[in-house]
Amino acid sequence: MNIIDELKWRGALNQATDEEGLRELTEEKKIALYCGTDPSGDSLHIGHLIPFMMLKRFQLAGHKPVILIGGGTGAIGDPSGRKTERDLETRSKLEQNVQSLTKQMIRLFGTENFTIVNNYDWLSKFTMIDFLRDYGKLFNLNTMLNKEVVASRLDAGISFTEFTYQILQAIDFLHLYRHNDVQLQIGGSDQWGNITSGIDLIHKVEGSDTKVFGVTIPLMLKADGTKFGKTAGGAVWLDPEKTSPYEFYQFWLNQDDRDVVKYLKYFTFLSQEEIAGLEEKVQTEPWKREAQRRLAQEVTTFVHGQAATDQAEKISAILFSGNIQDLTTAEVEQAFAGTPSVEVSAEPANIVDWLVDTKIEPSKRQAREDVKNGAIRVNGEKVTDLEATLDPTAKFDGKYVVIRRGKKNYTLAKVHA
């Protein structure tokens, strides 16, 4: 199957400047293509996986992906998809972010048949006179004003800095065409105007018959109409220090039946036959959640590796069984990273007093009632003795106490000396 046809089957293709021309080109030869991301943070998040999965599919088909980190454009701020102007980062902070993102991208793409570039390397060499003389005269103001990314901001106001962003992105495409033989730019649906600006610039400078293309990816929406990638707790990061592999795994495991097949097509490398089989399972045995489990396994392994997936599944099984004592200290940190936590001293205390002092229980009366009724578990073990003494350093290297009140209400007590 041609790579373009596969992208269409997977629901990954939204707009294309010349779909047939691109199909012919990718059948004739292996091409270089690029996607850009500005270093506005020190970690990628799952929203970045949307364009990166397309790049990865091209890479697996033998093409050469290039990721452009916007060390230069990041100092300006992309207005695409925004109602207000971005707060700009300092030069040193941007450079730190560039280094962090580079490490994560190498983890996803490896080093073979893959290139990372930073547009600061060429954009920073322009003087204002160079910029206006060599490029400013090639852009029509009326055309720029009619681009959706600009038109949507005119009433609220857009700075000249953000207004010129599309010119800088166009220069990027031209630079990569000249120096890296890049013939295709991909981006989110909000990048269409910026992508076509780059193609127009290349045609003006290199000739109208130059074979360059642009494609965009559909906006990823959940079945309930909300945007994919956000949770009640915020973004889901690819950095394991920001979102643990267990939390990452759980995000995918908890996807709605109405969304899971779409995500299997988009975020995994499973075949049509495998996905069709999982789709049938969703329809006939949805309670088994086999499709969600496979989705979680595939994406977690792609981002964090097989060992992290195995550990996430181990934690999940232990939490389901309630055998908290079987977790290691590191696994406790992962499993309960998103749960309410309290700071406690290392001093042993009566269980009832301790539950009230930590505010896990609202009163001694309620604490006594819950203990007597067997509703309190300490590190996985039920406590029913009102006179029991709790030693915070007894488990997990003396660092944590895991309290469960009722069936699902966990609190992580962090022990300090």
Curated annotation (Swiss-Prot):
Binding site for L-tyrosine: Y34, Y165, Q169
Pfam assignment, any one: tRNA-synt_1b
EC number: 6.1.1.1
InterPro entries (UniProt xref): aa-tRNA-synth_I_CS (IPR001412), aa-tRNA-synth_Ic (IPR002305), Rossmann-like_a/b/a_fold (IPR014729), S4_RNA-bd (IPR002942), S4_RNA-bd_sf (IPR036986), SYY-like_C (IPR054608), Tyr-tRNA-ligase (IPR002307), Tyr-tRNA-ligase_bac-type (IPR024088)
One Gene Ontology biological process: tyrosyl-tRNA aminoacylation
Gene Ontology MF: a single term: ATP binding
Location in or out of the cell: Cytoplasm
PROSITE patterns for this protein: AA_TRNA_LIGASE_I, S4
SUPFAM superfamilies documented for this protein: Alpha-L RNA-binding motif, Nucleotidylyl transferase
Motif ('KMSKS' region): 227-231
Segments forming domain S4 RNA-binding: 349-415
Predominant localisation class: cytoplasm
Motif range ('HIGH' region): 39-48
Record-linked HAMAP family: Tyr_tRNA_synth_type1
Record text on subunit structure and interactions: Homodimer.
Protein name: Tyrosine--tRNA ligase
Source species of the chain: Limosilactobacillus fermentum (strain NBRC 3956 / LMG 18251)
Lineage, uppermost ranks: Bacteria, Bacillati, Bacillota, Bacilli, Lactobacillales
